[in-house]
């Protein structure tokens, strides 16, 4: 054989164009290369860890053996460019654009209202596009699997799924209630349209068809390259790492002998994360992706041999094919593997992660290794000394030195045997989320019986997620051999395993009791599964099994969500050109879908631009003894290090410093920043800054700590009505308790982003920032630099999600960057990594609510005394406003005649918490709903009856003495009861629960009264600038910021109506403090209200100027009138202004008319829980919302759905975990789980109530951006109802309050049974726990 040649030339294609790189840097990933090198910015950075899908691209390769081209999606943030030799990459720009033509996927996701902020949209588009390249008519299951690796924080997924579903060969709909016609295609005649309810948000028939022949062809040059000899070693040398990709097995083995410590990389899904988050680098990395022997598939009578290089998707496809061809008794192991592969990671990760990498990494949460370990699988390994076989058993998985690969050995393939007739294998896993989440605990279990008996001859049980490695219950298994498979064996096995499978207190990951309970619960499920199969083989030989028990073996199905959205159609007499009230597509929808929408970090890098990385505190409360940045300053590419000493003006606001100076008050506080010529260099240098601390006591982390040390921010707030103490004495019953609500991360898809560009004279600066409040950012930067605000111009084109998290924080971060820009005299780009964003910026306030309720036996509440404590973190931020709002809105929909509410903000050593969608209402009203449920349980009454009994019924006054009319509240409630068929379904739930022991359903209906607005009058003002050009085109600028909530779309609609011109004439450029100064924050659901009035005012001014010209020439065109106005020297630009509602609260008197109006609503949700694992399935949700006269029903319904799913996450999924020292563990989607596409309700119906006038807002509309968040608690209380049903059946006492979020752990441990009782309770006093609740 001729010696292998060496080449340093990397060749691949991007969107049909050839890319050639010599000595490519192995540490450069595809995402960076696309965005910063070849300037394709449609692919977005969302997390950097492959978990969010924002950077999804399609990769295509040609296989010279099969002569086939494969297409697969991948997350570009984890793909090293060196791995792309011979590949074709397709990005969102490559499939369509507004400059050429848009692709059907792009069109449908945009016109189907599947975009809001648009940051996740390119990734969604590319996931769907790749699926269609492989399956032009996909199944619904394929769509759900495909989208499982993509996250969206705005839409609630329903419109995205619906857009994708339009490509299925047949889509389900209501069929006109059985008439056999599609509701989306039904046209109504004019008389029927008058005052009718519409259910069509877009015209499906307008979609262009999918034509697979029009896609990009695979480059012929790459086909020729693949056909050529593999006798080439590719070598790419970077700054710190050399990448070597051999072409033959001999070359690979020689390299591994020469570099035994060099890691092997194919998918980079493990090593990439390890290198990124630990800053570990390897001198040599070897890529065996071109070694044909690693991709072998051999199927014999003995079993399957699977190449170690096969991706998990390829393994899944192979196993599916084999299982379809063999009898079930031979495929037990294969079926178990398939079950795990369906939910292991997201589709993009499964497409690139290799089987061998999954095995060799030996991660404790590996889903496949426990099955392979009990399946007598064999590892075929090779070295220069020859081939060797290593058993893949518990010793290998535990890392026993004699049982694992030697450094010079390479895993070639894995042999997975077929199962025998009397062999039974099962797999189990429970994760925080159904898809794309590491398992909390998983297991592989196998039993072999003596032929035709139930006598155990072999037993194997392996658990993942219990210890530092996959662990075996080997001792228990050996003791059970020879026993019969019966209940006595099960009881003994549970006790043995509970004793053997130990989990120390404070074990990493926490949840010690829950994890041990899962281990035993899985054993019981295995027992039932095997018993069921034995019974199937011989119905007479084995005892009957109650159907009430067998239901636990049914996994929650992966079903596609569907629903109906209904709203009031516009009057049939309304001109077609008038867009108000119509479901108009998001103004930037197409640009979102094509990747052409420009976000802050998409802007081109200027010559000399520097990148900023911050150094944050590692201590919660400490004195800074010394700071040594000398090593960082000497690092490659570093220009400067910026500290508090460099701040020329104010170093922050109130108690919040830009740069910590003498003391740090939380983990994550910015101490200094490194400016370098690349982000990588800045990051690497930042890690070299040495800071010496001295701890300061006390360290306050939790609300309880704050209460102990009386550590508060601001005064106690209090509201009271009636005579509370007297009413308590008259009550039949009194109930006291407390409830805890965890915090929530904003998780906007675009992390905090800012660019600061010094203009070179008069200290002027342009600031491009992702902010809800450009004027506040301008003010903070000006104060920091000690210059007037007129030298600072803030630009906000669009924001990739905000939810309150980009109101005050961007001002702080922009100021940090501005100091660096002024010091260096160069442009600064400061984009937070997801981990840093979550660490630094805070989120929703965790809450402790204490309540005392006095009520009558019929459920009527006479008195309530409620005390709220929120964890504000280390600085005030907006915390005082949040507690005020929580108190003002706490009563929700209920008239409690004697009510006292008090609230305090606790000052702790956590990062400062801040504004979040709902602003205190989701926390405060949750406490009230907990009280309602507790009263219902105590009185043994239906919860809905207690809620109805206590609701406002007539015009009345709130606890802060503001009058309101509850008519629409009651209508929403009644409509929700009717739309959801509540009482019929409640009966069905009861019947379901009677038939099942281990699965229970619950249903709950929750009303809502949401007060819209800010607490001060000055917030209700806005300005706009409308300019008409001589060609008739119109440019609109206003003070609101496009966050994804559709404000720009609505402003164009307003201008279109007022100017009586088509929307196509109107353009919005950006929000800028030059065009519209002194703006207020875009938030509190008022953005469209106030800015719409300002745009309306400006347009009316212009129309009044044009009025004489129009009267003189009534038959003229818009263009003619505009030109004539110019000829007559009439100004064609106008500033509109709106001064709105008077809103002031007198806390001394406890009263104030502070809210312009109320939004009413109701939601009914049904869930199903698995009592053995704690998993739950959201079956159906019906929402009715009072939106008055919606300006844009598509936008408003999208806001309701997105807010609801965000609330669903708050109350059931999203859990921030802190160490006792105040360190946030959950710093990315890897650990922190927001709702994914499989978490939303199977049926998801949203109805806008029949409109009624609302004179306080433009066109009688209402702001609906926040209200739906709280309605997510309907899922929580449905879960609570299901748990209550389980506890009642077990003879347990009711639980008055379940803490939020109702995670799988909370659900499982509340459903107490014989298995939870086996697990000894941990004593938190004996040692420090791994994590603690902070409220």
UniProtKB/Swiss-Prot annotation:
It is found in: Cytoplasm. The lineage of its organism: Eukaryota, Metazoa, Chordata, Craniata, Vertebrata. This is Aldehyde oxidase 3. Its cofactor is [2Fe-2S] cluster; FAD; Mo-molybdopterin. It comes from Mus musculus (Mouse). InterPro entries: 2Fe-2S-bd, 2Fe-2S-bd_dom_sf, 2Fe-2S_ferredoxin-like_sf, 2Fe-2S_ferredoxin-type, 2Fe2S_fd_BS, Ald_Oxase/Xan_DH_a/b, Ald_Oxase/Xan_DH_a/b_sf, Ald_Oxase/xanthine_DH-like. [2Fe-2S] cluster 2 binds at residues 117, 120, 152, 154. Its EC number is 1.2.3.1, 1.17.3.-. The active site is at 1266 (proton acceptor). AOX genes evolved from a xanthine oxidoreductase ancestral precursor via a series of gene duplication and suppression/deletion events. Different animal species contain a different complement of AOX genes encoding an equivalent number of AOX isoenzymes. In mammals, the two extremes are represented by certain rodents such as mice and rats, which are endowed with 4 AOX genes, and by humans, whose genome is characterized by a single active gene. Inhibited by potassium cyanide, menadione, benzamidine, raloxifene and norharmane. Belongs to the xanthine dehydrogenase family. The modification Phosphoserine is found at residue 320. Residues 236-421 form the FAD-binding PCMH-type domain. It holds the Pfam family CO_deh_flav_C.
């Amino acid at each position: 054989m001729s010696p292998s040649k060496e080449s340093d030339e990397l060749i691949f294609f991007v969107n049909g164009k050839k890319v050639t790189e010599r000595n490519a840097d192995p540490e450069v990933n595809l995402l960076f290369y696309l965005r910063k090198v070849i300037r394709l910015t449609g692919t977005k950075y969302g997390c950097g860890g492959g978990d969010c899908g924002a950077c999804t691209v399609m990769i295509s390769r040609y296989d010279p053996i099969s002569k086939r081209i494969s297409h697969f999606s991948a997350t570009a943030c984890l793909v090293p460019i060196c791995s792309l030799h011979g590949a074709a990459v397709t990005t969102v720009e490559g499939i369509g654009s507004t400059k050429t033509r848009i692709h059907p996927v792009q069109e449908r996701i945009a016109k189907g209202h599947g975009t809001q902020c648009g940051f996740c949209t390119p990734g969604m588009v590319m996931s769907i596009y790749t699926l269609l390249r492989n399956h032009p008519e996909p199944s619904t299951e394929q769509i759900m699997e495909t989208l499982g690796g993509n996250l969206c924080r705005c839409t609630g997924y329903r419109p995205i799924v619906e857009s994708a579903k339009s490509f299925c060969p047949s889509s389900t709909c209501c069929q006109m209630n059985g008439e056999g016609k599609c509701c989306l295609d039904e046209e109504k005649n004019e008389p029927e349209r008058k005052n009718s309810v519409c259910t069509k948000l877009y015209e499906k028939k307008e979609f262009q068809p999918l034509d697979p022949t029009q896609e990009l062809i695979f480059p012929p040059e790459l086909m020729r390259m693949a056909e050529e000899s593999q006798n080439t070693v590719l070598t790419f040398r970077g700054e710190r790492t050399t990448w070597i990709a051999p072409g033959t097995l001999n070359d690979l083995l020689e390299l591994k002998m020469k570099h035994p410590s060099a890691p092997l990389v194919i998918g980079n899904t493990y090593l990439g994360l390890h290198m990124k988050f630990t800053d570990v680098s390897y001198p040599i990395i070897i890529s065996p992706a071109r070694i044909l022997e690693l991709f072998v598939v051999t199927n014999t009578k003995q079993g399957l041999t699977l190449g170690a290089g096969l991706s998990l998707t390829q393994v899944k496809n192979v196993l599916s094919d084999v299982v379809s061809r063999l009898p079930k008794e031979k495929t037990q192991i294969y079926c178990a593997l398939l079950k795990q592969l369906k939910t292991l990671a997201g589709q993009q990760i499964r497409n690139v992660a290799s089987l061998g990498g999954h095995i060799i990494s030996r991660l404790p949460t590996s889903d496949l290794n426990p099955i392979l370990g009990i399946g007598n699988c064999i590892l075929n390994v090779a070295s220069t000394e020859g081939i060797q076989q290593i058993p893949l058993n518990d010793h290998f998985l535990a890392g026993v030195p004699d049982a694992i690969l030697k450094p010079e050995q390479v895993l070639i393939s894995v042999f997975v045997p077929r199962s025998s007739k009397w062999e039974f294998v099962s797999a189990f896993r429970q994760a925080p989320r159904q898809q794309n989440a590491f398992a909390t605990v998983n297991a592989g279990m196998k039993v072999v019986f003596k032929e035709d008996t139930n006598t155990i001859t072999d037993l194997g049980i392996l658990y993942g997620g219990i210890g530092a490695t996959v662990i075996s219950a080997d001792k228990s298994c050996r003791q059970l051999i020879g026993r019969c498979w019966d209940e006595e064996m099960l009881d003994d096995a549970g006790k043995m395993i509970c004793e053997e499978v130990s989990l120390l207190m404070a074990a990493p990951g926490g949840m010690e009791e829950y994890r041990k309970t899962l281990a035993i619960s899985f054993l019981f499920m295995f027992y039932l599964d095997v018993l069921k199969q034995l019974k199937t083989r011989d119905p007479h030989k084995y005892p009957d099994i109650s159907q009430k028990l067998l239901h636990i073996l049914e996994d929650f199905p992966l079903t596609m969500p569907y629903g109906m959205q209904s709203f009031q159609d516009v009057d049939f007499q309304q001109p077609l050109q008038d867009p108000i009230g119509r479901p108009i597509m998001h103004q930037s929808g197409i640009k979102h879908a094509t990747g052409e929408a420009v976000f802050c970090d998409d802007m081109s890098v200027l010559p000399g631009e520097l990148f900023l990385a911050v150094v944050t505190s590692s201590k919660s409360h400490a004195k800074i003894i010394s700071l040594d940045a000398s090593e960082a300053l000497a690092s490659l590419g570093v220009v400067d290090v910026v500290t508090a000493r460099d701040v020329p003006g104010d170093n922050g606001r109130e108690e919040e410093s830009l740069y910590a100076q003498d003391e740090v008050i939380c983990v994550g506080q910015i101490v200094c920043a490194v400016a370098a010529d690349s982000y990588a260099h800045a990051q690497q240098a930042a890690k070299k800054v040495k800071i010496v601390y001295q701890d300061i006591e006390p360290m306050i982390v939790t609300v309880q700590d704050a209460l102990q040390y009386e550590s508060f921010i601001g005064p106690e707030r209090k509201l009271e009505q009636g005579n509370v103490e007297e009413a308590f004495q008259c009550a039949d019953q009194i109930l006291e308790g407390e409830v805890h609500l965890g915090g929530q991360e904003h998780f906007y898809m675009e992390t905090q982003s800012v660019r600061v560009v010094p203009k070179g004279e008069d200290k002027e600066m342009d600031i491009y920032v992702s902010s809800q409040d450009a004027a506040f950012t301008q003010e903070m930067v000006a104060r920091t630099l000690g210059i007037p605000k007129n030298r600072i111009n803030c630009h906000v084109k669009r924001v990739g999600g905000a939810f309150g998290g980009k109101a005050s924080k961007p001002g702080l971060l922009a100021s940090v960057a501005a100091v660096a820009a002024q010091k260096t005299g160069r442009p600064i780009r400061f984009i937070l990594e997801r981990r840093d964003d979550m660490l630094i910026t805070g989120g929703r306030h965790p809450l402790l609510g204490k309540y005392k309720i006095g009520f009558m036996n019929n459920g009527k509440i006479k008195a309530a005394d409620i005390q709220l404590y929120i964890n504000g973190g280390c600085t005030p931020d907006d915390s005082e406003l949040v507690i005020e709002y929580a108190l003002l809105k706490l009563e929700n929909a209920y008239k409690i005649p004697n009510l006292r509410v008090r609230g305090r903000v606790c000052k702790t050593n956590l990062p400062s918490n801040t504004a979040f969608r709902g602003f205190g209402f989701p926390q405060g009203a949750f406490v009230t709903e907990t009280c309602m449920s507790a009263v219902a349980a105590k009185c043994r009454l239906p919860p809905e009856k207690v809620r109805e009994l206590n609701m406002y019924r007539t015009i009345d006054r709130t606890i802060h003495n503001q009058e309101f009319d509850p008519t629409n509240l009651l209508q929403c409630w009644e409509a929700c009861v009717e739309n959801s068929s509540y009482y019929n379904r409640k009966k069905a739930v009861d019947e379901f629960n009677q038939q099942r022991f281990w699965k229970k359903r619950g249903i709950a209906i929750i009303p809502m009264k949401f007060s819209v607005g800010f607490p001060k009058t000055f917030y209700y003002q806005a300005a706009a600038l409308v300019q008409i050009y001589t060609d008739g085109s119109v440019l609109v600028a206003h003070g609101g910021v496009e966050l994804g909530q559709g404000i720009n779309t609505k402003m164009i609609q307003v201008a279109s109506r007022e100017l009586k011109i088509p929307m196509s004439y109107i353009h919005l450029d950006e929000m800028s403090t030059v065009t519209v100064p002194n703006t207020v924050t875009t938030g509190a659901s008022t953005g469209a209200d106030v800015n719409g009035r300002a745009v309306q005012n400006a347009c009316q001014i212009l129309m009044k100027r044009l009025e004489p010209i129009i009267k003189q020439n009534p038959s003229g065109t818009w263009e003619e009138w505009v030109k004539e106005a110019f000829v007559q020297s009439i100004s064609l630009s106008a500033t509109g202004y709106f001064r709105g509602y008077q809103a002031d609260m007198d806390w001394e008197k406890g009263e104030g008319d502070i809210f312009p109006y109320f939004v009413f609503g109701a939601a009914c949700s049904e869930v199903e829980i698995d009592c053995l694992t704690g998993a739950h399935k959201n079956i159906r949700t019906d929402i009715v919302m009072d939106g008055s006269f919606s300006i844009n029903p598509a936008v408003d319904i999208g806001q309701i759905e997105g807010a609801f799913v965000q609330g669903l996450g708050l109350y059931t999924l999203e859990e921030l975990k802190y160490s006792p020292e105040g360190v946030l563990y959950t710093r990315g989607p890897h650990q922190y789980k927001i709702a994914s596409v499989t978490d939303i309700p199977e049926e998801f119906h949203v109805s806008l109530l029949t409109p009624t006038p609302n004179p306080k807002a433009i066109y009688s509309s209402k702001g609906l951006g926040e209200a739906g968040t709280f309605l997510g608690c309907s899922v929580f209380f449905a879960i609570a109802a299901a748990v209550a049903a389980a506890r009642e059946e077990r003879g347990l006492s009711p639980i008055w309050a379940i803490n939020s979020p109702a995670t799988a752990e909370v659900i499982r441990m509340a459903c107490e049974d014989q298995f939870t009782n086996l697990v000894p309770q941990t004593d938190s006093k004996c040692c420090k726990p791994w994590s603690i609740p902070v409220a």
